[in-house]
């Protein structure tokens, strides 16, 4: 099946409506809005939630994981301030939707998922959409992906009680990380900028993410 076969006009219309909602919610980056308009979110959600694919809400994708609310995807991507030549590390591939948005806007995307089944499904979707700048790994995201570090940008799509040390080390000086930090039930989304080895935080507001599990994350 090709992209044209499943991206029916009704879905394109729904994406346009979603973009208008995101504008009203305060998303300003036209590049981010264009990526949201282009990437078919409906292929990243389970079939039973197809009718909700373009609602501004998070949806279950199995394995106690979710596909993030489109507003949060847009907010996190906007905070990364991508120019098009960056190497990005994504922690938590999930459905692959955020990965596809990043692939639209960055030079290279390295994405890690601890649940093999999710990673394999995401890889199929990314291939179907024709992206050739995404590299997948199954493993502990809190350890990062040292082989290809340092990264210009790091995005973490699960909640941590603090910034995992390996991610601090793998972020290029002058780089930006977007990560939810807090407890299990509520967090704040932070834009972290690394300058001369120091880390500066900007609070982007309250959020709720699934926990980041791993050696430098939650243990259970």
UniProtKB/Swiss-Prot annotation:
Which molecular function terms from Gene Ontology are attached?
Answer: protein-L-isoaspartate (D-aspartate) O-methyltransferase activity
Catalytic residues as annotated in Swiss-Prot or TrEMBL: 68
- What keywords sit in the KW lines? Cytoplasm, Methyltransferase, S-adenosyl-L-methionine, Transferase
- Catalytic activities: [protein]-L-isoaspartate + S-adenosyl-L-methionine = [protein]-L-isoaspartate alpha-methyl ester + S-adenosyl-L-homocysteine
Which segments of the protein form a coiled coil according to its record? none
Q: CDD domains annotated for this entry?
A: AdoMet_MTases
EC numbers on record: 2.1.1.77
Is the Methyltransferase keyword given for this protein?
A: yes
Which Pfam families does the record match to this protein?
PCMT
Protein's cellular compartments? Cytoplasm
One GO process term, biological-process aspect: methylation
Say if the entry is tagged with keyword S-adenosyl-L-methionine: yes
The entry's cellular-component GO terms read: cytoplasm
The top EC class is: transferase
Give the protein family.
Belongs to the methyltransferase superfamily. L-isoaspartyl/D-aspartyl protein methyltransferase family.
NCBIfam families per record: pimt, PRK00312.1
What this chain does, per the record?
Catalyzes the methyl esterification of L-isoaspartyl residues in peptides and proteins that result from spontaneous decomposition of normal L-aspartyl and L-asparaginyl residues. It plays a role in the repair and/or degradation of damaged proteins.
What name is this protein filed under? Protein-L-isoaspartate O-methyltransferase
Q: Which organism is it from?
A: Dictyoglomus turgidum (strain DSM 6724 / Z-1310)
Q: Its gene?
A: pcm
């Amino acid at each position: 099946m090709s992209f044209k076969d499943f991206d029916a006009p009704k879905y394109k219309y729904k994406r346009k409506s979603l973009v208008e909602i995101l504008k009203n919610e305060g998303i300003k980056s036209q590049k981010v809005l264009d990526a949201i308009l282009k990437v078919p979110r409906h292929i990243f959600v389970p079939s039973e939630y197809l009718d909700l694919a373009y609602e501004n809400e998070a949806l279950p994708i199995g394995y106690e994981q979710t596909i993030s609310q489109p507003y949060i995807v847009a907010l996190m991507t906007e905070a990364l301030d991508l120019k098009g030549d960056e190497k990005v590390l994504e922690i938590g591939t999930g459905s692959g939707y955020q990965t596809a948005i990043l692939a639209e806007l960055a030079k290279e995307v390295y994405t890690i998922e601890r649940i093999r089944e999710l990673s394999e499904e995401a890889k199929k979707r990314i291939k179907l959409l024709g992206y050739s700048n995404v590299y997948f790994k199954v493993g502990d995201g809190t350890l990062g992906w040292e082989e290809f570090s340092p990264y210009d940008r790091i995005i973490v799509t699960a909640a941590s009680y603090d910034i995992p040390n390996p991610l601090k080390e793998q972020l290029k000086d002058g780089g930006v990380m977007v990560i939810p930090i807090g407890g299990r039930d509520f967090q704040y989304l932070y834009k972290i900028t690394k300058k001369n080895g120091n880390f500066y935080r900007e609070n982007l507001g309250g959020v709720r993410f699934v926990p980041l599990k791993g050696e430098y994350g939650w243990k259970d």
